[in-house]
């Protein structure tokens, strides 16, 4: 078969990398900013603002993964069985992944964790996108205010719920 007729077998690479284990999720839950609505909770940790604290022989795994793999952001999806059966859970995960792909520029340098609730299944893609953008912009605004406060000497605060 001629080379020009062969289909390209490689897929384009994803701009994100996924959170893999409990310790990575826990770091985002504990150190990140959180925002809740009736459909899902969003936890965001800004990895680009704070430099990784390195001890001897230890590197911060989240910050290193952004630099090493050339990923723009890290994504974690925590969809409980309470949300619905496997078909519903997978639909929600596909929608959330495509949302972050669509708005990858907004997510750059962040570690995001979505925790959908059972009402999330009944939202269509555009309503889900609207809620996601509202929550992400409010968290980013709050993070910028907190960063300015840290420069003035305030302590770290979390986003209000």
Swiss-Prot record:
Q: Where is this region: Disordered?
A: 1-20
Q: Which InterPro entries match?
A: Ribosomal_Su5_D2-typ_SF (IPR020568), Ribsml_uS5_D2-typ_fold_subgr (IPR014721), RNase_P (IPR000100), RNase_P_CS (IPR020539)
A GO biological process of this protein is: tRNA 5'-leader removal
Q: Does the keyword Hydrolase apply?
A: yes
EC code = 3.1.26.5
The UniProt subunit note reads as follows: Consists of a catalytic RNA component (M1 or rnpB) and a protein subunit.
Protein name in UniProt: Ribonuclease P protein component
Taxonomic source organism: Helicobacter pylori (strain P12)
Lineage runs: Bacteria, Pseudomonadati, Campylobacterota, Epsilonproteobacteria, Campylobacterales
């Amino acid at each position: 078969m001629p080379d020009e007729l062969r289909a390209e077998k490689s897929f384009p690479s994803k701009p994100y990398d996924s959170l893999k284990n409990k310790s990575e999720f826990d770091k985002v839950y504990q150190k990140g900013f959180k925002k809740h609505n009736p459909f899902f909770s969003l936890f965001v940790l800004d990895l680009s603002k704070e430099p990784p604290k390195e001890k001897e022989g230890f590197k911060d795994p989240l910050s290193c993964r952004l630099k090493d793999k050339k990923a723009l952001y890290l994504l974690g999806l925590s969809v409980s069985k309470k949300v619905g059966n496997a078909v519903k859970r997978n639909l929600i995960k596909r929608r959330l992944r495509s949302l972050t792909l669509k708005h990858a520029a907004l997510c750059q340098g962040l570690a995001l964790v979505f925790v959908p609730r059972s009402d999330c299944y009944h939202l269509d893609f555009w309503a889900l996108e609207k809620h996601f953008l509202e929550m992400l912009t409010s968290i980013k605004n709050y993070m910028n205010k907190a960063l300015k406060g840290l420069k003035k000497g305030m302590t770290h605060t979390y986003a209000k719920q």
